[in-house]
Each structure stands twice: as C-alpha cells, then as structure tokens.
Amino acid sequence: MIPVPTGARVWLATGYTDMRRGFPSLALQVQEVLRKDPLSGHLFVFRGRRSDLVKLIWHDGQGACLFTKRLERGRFIWPSVAGEAVTISSAQLSYLLSGIDWRNPQEALRPTRVG
C-alpha cells in the first residue's frame, strides 16, 4: 500500500484515461481537466478503458511519483460521475488497490498461481 501523507487527499479521475500516458501528460490532465494542482502533494488516480489498470500520480515535495497497478482478475470499481473528480479516503484507496469494492468492502480475489 502507498502511504498517503497526512493532509493529502485522494482524487479519482472519473471516466477513462489513456494508460500510455506518463507523469507529464497525466499532470497536465489534472491541471486542465480536473482543475487541481498536480504538485500539491495530493494523489490522483486514473483508470484504463478495461478497468483492470490504474495509475496514481503525486508529487512528494522532492519529485514526481507514478504508481501503476494491474489486476490479474476482476475490475477496479469506479464512480459513474462523468467529467469530475471524486475524493476518497486513504482506507478506501487501500481497498481500491486491493481489488475490493471500496464502497462496500468485501473479501478480495487472490491469485491462485503465478505465470
């Protein structure tokens, strides 16, 4: 789990994002579409079209951070609000990254084998 700094908010970018993007273009999306400051220390979470891949970006005061996670099975649960950003708690982010429905936590699917 990514340690969320005290006072940092977690923002989910609704809709789909091109997962070929890196930190610079995701930061530009945060700035232009979400109207937030990508260097604020807050975490911004994006998902791909198939909903099995997410990317998180944040600036920790020393540099830009990019985290990527792909689920082996299942899909990331995402809000259906279009064109906006939704804020969630750090606990909900932990559920989200574990493949658990962060709105109604249940047991996660675990991989049974590697390869």
Regions found by a protein language model. Name each.
Residues M1-G115:
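Polybasic/polar functional segments that serve as interface/processing modules
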